Amino acid sequence: MSRLTLLVTFVVVLALEPITTGNAAPSGDAKRGEKLFSTLPCVSCHDVTKPWPGGDICPNLGNIATEAARLVRTREYRGKAKTAAEYIRESIVEPNAYIVPGAAYRAADGQSVMPKDFGSTLSGAQIDDIVAYLLTRR
């Protein structure tokens, strides 16, 4: 095989390789995430059976995967996430990155009512599990 043929073959193979865009499924386990979500204080504020945003205390999360994917493409969103998984993770570890519009979701100081310490009190694996679970809520 000539060098030119090898080079062309190599370029074609590279062109066919999938490029990672951050849309890959999270490494977490959705079943473990569901259990964590129901045993941590998450369920005391969030309802996963009703559609987003809604909710009296915090946004409902019944269709958060769909809404998060839509939200990160809007002008109103000011966070850093580019995918639904990134948005959900950001909401857990950095809840002030984007606060869903609505007075009920803000404390008197204008900050999110979501606890700000989950990034330090939960392990990375636990957060991955919760993200994986919430991505099942379409």
Predicted regions and their residues:
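Soluble non-cytosolic domains of exported or imported proteins
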Residues: 79-86, 121-125
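Bacterial Sec-dependent signal peptides at the C-terminal "C-region" and cleavage site
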Residues: 15-27
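Periplasmic/extracellular electron-transfer cofactor-ligation site
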Residues: 26-82, 93-107, 136-138
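N-terminal secretory signal peptides that target proteins for export/translocation
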Residues: 1-3
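C-terminal capping alpha-helices of c-type cytochrome domains
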Residues: 26, 107-138
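Bacterial N-terminal signal peptides
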Residues: 5-18
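Extracytoplasmic
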Residues: 56, 87, 109-111
